[in-house]
Amino acid sequence: MLGDSLSAEYGLKRGSGWVALLEKKLQAEKLPVTVVNASISGDTTAGGRSRLAGLLTQHRPTHVIIELGANDALRGLPLQLTEDNLNQMTQAAQKSGAKVLLIGMQMPPNYGKDYGARFTALYAAVAKINKAALVPFLLKGIADAPGNAADSTRLFQADRIHPKEEAHPLMLANVWPELKKILK
């Protein structure tokens, strides 16, 4: 698991984030999978790319989940750079023999409609080019909760960026169907 604060339990008690919940689900399903959470709060695709080779050598994973890119966008980094880094990470993981699940994100509307649409689309493009599995939006049903503005912020910490503990089961529910397909 290569991700940022959304996967590194930022602001949560240890063992309550969606990756820890995934590990418990895998155990309950009696799937012989070991989860290595190499997520770092604040990480970008460049940071993930620079760490990936060492992680692949050290752990020799059969599956790699990549949840990166949100911090690139929040920092206003060029979308082509983000896409290139995601492509390189996906290809490196696949070259090592791992199946890849790419987890997409979306940007708030204040980044502009065009930027947001292009950012969202780059995940689908990377997944398609590399024939990788894709979860289009990790925060589906959380950041885009139905109803009024209060509904869409109630599942977030005070910073309105990081989900509260009660949102993490929903995040796992967004990931599990696609992950289960590639675990077979």
PLM regions: where:
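Serine-esterase "nucleophile elbow" of acetyl-processing enzymes
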Residues: 1-41, 51-60
